[in-house]
Amino acid sequence: MAELRNGRIRHTVVFTPSHAPGSEAEADFLAAAAQLEDIPGVEAFEILRETSPKNAYRFGISMEFADRAAYASYNEHPDHVRFVGERWLPEVADFLEIDYEPSVRFGASHSEGGS
């Protein structure tokens, strides 16, 4: 993933759908979520499958915005509001949302070792 530049926002959410893994209902939900990419201002959109046994979440969504105004516009967009109300809230069992912006730069010695 490219480095997040000053002023940009990375919106991420990890989640577990309430549908059975691999089910048609799960696939339909993910297809509906993929349409969020079409909302103006959304960049670098990805739907990701969790591979680590370190948590119980099954998927992640990541996207970027040019700035806070673009992110606010996305949050208020009718398609996003509709998706959250009609699909997300009734079909997601658990989730964690985290929004990032660039922080202090550290040298290589601080970024080695992973998390």
What are these regions (language model features)?
Residues 37, 79-84:
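A common structural junction motif
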Residues 1-59, 66-76, 99-115:
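Short S/T/G/P-rich N-terminal loop/turn motif that feeds into the first structured element of a domain
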Residues 93-99:
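C-terminal end-helix/capping segment
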Residues 41, 91-93:
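Short loop/turn motifs at secondary-structure junctions
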Residues 75, 84-87:
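Short, flexible helix/strand-to-coil boundary loops that buttress conserved ligand/catalytic motifs
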Residues 36, 87-90:
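Short, conserved catalytic or adaptor-binding loops enriched in Gly and charged residues
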